[in-house]
Amino acid sequence: MVKLRLKRCGRK
């Protein structure tokens, strides 16, 4: 999902 991708990018 896009929401999961955005959260993973922000945590990196």
Curated annotation (Swiss-Prot):
Its main location: plastid. GO terms for molecular function: structural constituent of ribosome. The lineage of its organism: Eukaryota, Viridiplantae, Streptophyta, Embryophyta, Tracheophyta. This is Small ribosomal subunit protein bS16c. GO terms for biological process: translation. The keyword Cytoplasm does not apply. Signal peptide: none annotated. Belongs to the bacterial ribosomal protein bS16 family. PROSITE patterns: RIBOSOMAL_S16. It is found in: Plastid, Chloroplast. One of its GO terms (cellular component) is ribosome. The keyword Chloroplast applies. Transmembrane segments: none annotated. Keywords: Chloroplast, Plastid, Ribonucleoprotein, Ribosomal protein.
